[in-house]
């Protein structure tokens, strides 16, 4: 089982390959303290999402050790592991039904107040009150909502899960700037009490991280705070300036 209380994560010399002769992660060692905002950046294909797959028990065939709260994740049942972490991607699934039904997937006994509180945090409550409130109906995959609204609703649902660890895998890609800014504000606030593991190709979103891992070809090329990495004038600084 995963221990109770604040959890830290440690990876030691983690290697992973989808195919025998093509290693994706080449000896990754990282430590994530509890209640920290950790970001992973780098060109696509550098191993960021593969790493998220290992942490969520999707990618099992790795070598090396991955521990949560000092317990190796290979000794933890997947459903037990996932009760301690919530993963939000850029296309989080919403199903046809009411907003209330979608939110209660995360917490079946959530009260009206709890649901309205998380909707307020993601700035959707006023919009929904102009519709049918919690009874507002979503079409299949939420297609009657904008991309930014769908993502904010997925985030509201994630907040109801209330797990110690949150993994955001490109959760702010392909949405409007206003929604992106709102989501980043929620994530920054969340990082005060939760561990945030944040994967992003947009470096402006990772500036406030406690630690940034710049990955390249399956290894950690650079690590540190934004200020530290900018002073290094290496790959991170080059990519950051290129994106300005």
Where are these regions (language model features)?
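ABC-type nucleotide-binding domain
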Residues: 2-244
